[in-house]
């Protein structure tokens, strides 16, 4: 597991109150981890803070799974 993958999963588990072992790459924030719209906004903000990046709203709307979050961070890290 890459450092980025590990950090994303840690943030997801902390933000959504999920057990880290339950946070899989294919996990959907809403369907599998029980996130609501406020949770997803807070999750995006936490990712932005952790990785010192800005995720535009239109991009954030496309990030619905753990893997998509990992891929976005990998592609957009400075």
From Swiss-Prot:
<comment type="similarity">
    <text>Belongs to the acyl carrier protein (ACP) family.</text>
</comment>
<keyword id="KW-0443">Lipid metabolism</keyword>
<dbReference type="InterPro" id="IPR003231">
    <property type="entry name" value="ACP"/>
</dbReference>
<feature type="modified residue" description="O-(pantetheine 4'-phosphoryl)serine">
    <location>
        <position position="37"/>
    </location>
</feature>
<dbReference type="GO" id="GO:0009245">
    <property type="term" value="P:lipid A biosynthetic process"/>
</dbReference>
<keyword id="KW-0275">Fatty acid biosynthesis</keyword>
<dbReference type="InterPro" id="IPR036736">
    <property type="entry name" value="ACP-like_sf"/>
</dbReference>
<keyword id="KW-0597">Phosphoprotein</keyword>
<dbReference type="Pfam" id="PF00550">
    <property type="entry name" value="PP-binding"/>
</dbReference>
<feature type="domain" description="Carrier">
    <location>
        <begin position="2"/>
        <end position="77"/>
    </location>
</feature>
<keyword id="KW-0596">Phosphopantetheine</keyword>
<comment type="pathway">
    <text>Lipid metabolism; fatty acid biosynthesis.</text>
</comment>
<keyword id="KW-0963">Cytoplasm</keyword>
<dbReference type="GO" id="GO:0005829">
    <property type="term" value="C:cytosol"/>
</dbReference>
<dbReference type="GO" id="GO:0000036">
    <property type="term" value="F:acyl carrier activity"/>
</dbReference>
<dbReference type="InterPro" id="IPR006162">
    <property type="entry name" value="Ppantetheine_attach_site"/>
</dbReference>
<keyword id="KW-0276">Fatty acid metabolism</keyword>
<dbReference type="GO" id="GO:0016020">
    <property type="term" value="C:membrane"/>
</dbReference>
<dbReference type="GO" id="GO:0000035">
    <property type="term" value="F:acyl binding"/>
</dbReference>
<protein>
    <recommendedName>
        <fullName>Acyl carrier protein</fullName>
    </recommendedName>
</protein>
<keyword id="KW-0444">Lipid biosynthesis</keyword>
<dbReference type="InterPro" id="IPR009081">
    <property type="entry name" value="PP-bd_ACP"/>
</dbReference>
<comment type="function">
    <text>Carrier of the growing fatty acid chain in fatty acid biosynthesis.</text>
</comment>
């Amino acid at each position: 597991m890459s450092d980025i993958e590990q950090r994303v999963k840690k943030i997801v588990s902390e933000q959504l109150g999920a057990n880290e072992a339950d946070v899989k790459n294919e996990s959907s924030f809403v369907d599998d981890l029980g996130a609501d719209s406020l949770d997803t906004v807070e999750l995006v903000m936490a990712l932005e803070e952790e990785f010192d990046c800005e995720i535009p709203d239109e991009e954030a709307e496309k990030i619905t799974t753990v893997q998509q979050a990992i891929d976005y961070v990998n592609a957009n890290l400075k």
